[in-house]
């Protein structure tokens, strides 16, 4: 099922007519391009562009109220200096399953030294894969998800610079969470992102980590479930 991250809009407006036109364009694009991924719902909202802002090296603070926190997706440049998405709460957290949430929670609570967060594989448009860890950090007024244990290599390999516009999709193989990274050019036609996404899905299915998904039923279960636009600030 294809879903878009739902964000709380602050200071942004759009007309219903404009949203309807954009939805129709997305619907047509999916019908033409969607030959590798099986989508069951429309992306019903416009892509939200977010700016990755500095977390100012704040120390994580305990936040016992997990439900009330406002998590957002961000990345870690190194162990201490970290940077994250601006403080817009993610309203739809369904891109994580129960096992992944438990691993993230165990790392956050420091239950064991062996708890490192949830395993994630980031795939770029060339099919290059990088294993990362998805973790949770609580700041003074917000709770962030961070990508660590290899993000610096992602920046280098994809030549990411300040102001780079990129799009992250999440999807699951039978036992692994993937993030597909697509550099997003606002001047390109909307179909380009779908072409890149389908290419990523095809390349991912062919890798060794998805050997178990060679039968048709398992392969058909590989579906995109999250979309997020980001603007990188290093």
From Swiss-Prot:
<dbReference type="Pfam" id="PF03754">
    <property type="entry name" value="At2g31720-like"/>
</dbReference>
<dbReference type="GO" id="GO:0005634">
    <property type="term" value="C:nucleus"/>
</dbReference>
<keyword id="KW-0539">Nucleus</keyword>
<dbReference type="InterPro" id="IPR005508">
    <property type="entry name" value="At2g31720-like"/>
</dbReference>
<keyword id="KW-0805">Transcription regulation</keyword>
<dbReference type="InterPro" id="IPR003340">
    <property type="entry name" value="B3_DNA-bd"/>
</dbReference>
<feature type="region of interest" description="Disordered">
    <location>
        <begin position="55"/>
        <end position="88"/>
    </location>
</feature>
<keyword id="KW-0238">DNA-binding</keyword>
<keyword id="KW-0804">Transcription</keyword>
<feature type="compositionally biased region" description="Polar residues">
    <location>
        <begin position="60"/>
        <end position="72"/>
    </location>
</feature>
<dbReference type="InterPro" id="IPR015300">
    <property type="entry name" value="DNA-bd_pseudobarrel_sf"/>
</dbReference>
<dbReference type="GO" id="GO:0003677">
    <property type="term" value="F:DNA binding"/>
</dbReference>
<protein>
    <recommendedName>
        <fullName>Putative B3 domain-containing protein At2g18810</fullName>
    </recommendedName>
</protein>
<feature type="DNA-binding region" description="TF-B3">
    <location>
        <begin position="87"/>
        <end position="185"/>
    </location>
</feature>
């Amino acid at each position: 099922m294809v879903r878009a991250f739902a964000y709380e809009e602050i200071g942004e407006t759009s007309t219903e007519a404009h949203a309807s036109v954009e939805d129709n364009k997305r619907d047509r694009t999916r019908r033409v391009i969607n030959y590798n991924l099986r989508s069951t719902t429309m992306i019903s909202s416009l892509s939200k562009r977010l700016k990755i802002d500095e977390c100012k090296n704040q120390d994580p603070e305990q936040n016992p109220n997990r439900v009330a926190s406002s998590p957002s997706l961000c990345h870690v440049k190194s162990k201490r200096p970290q940077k994250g998405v601006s403080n817009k709460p993610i309203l739809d957290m369904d891109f994580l399953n129960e096992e992944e949430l438990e691993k993230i929670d165990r790392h956050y609570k420091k239950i064991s030294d062996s708890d490192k967060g949830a395993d994630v594989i980031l795939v770029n448009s060339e099919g290059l894969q990088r294993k990362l860890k998805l973790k949770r950090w609580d700041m003074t007024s917000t709770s962030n998800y961070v990508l660590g244990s290899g993000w610096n290599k992602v920046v280098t390999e994809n030549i990411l610079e300040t102001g780079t516009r990129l799009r992250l999709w999440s999807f699951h193989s039978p036992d692994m969470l993937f993030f597909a990274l697509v550099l997003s050019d606002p001047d390109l036609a909307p179909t380009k992102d779908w072409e890149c996404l389908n290419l990523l899905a095809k390349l991912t299915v062919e890798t060794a980590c998805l050997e178990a998904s060679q039968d048709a039923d398992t392969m058909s279960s590989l579906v995109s479930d999250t979309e997020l636009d980001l603007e990188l600030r290093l």
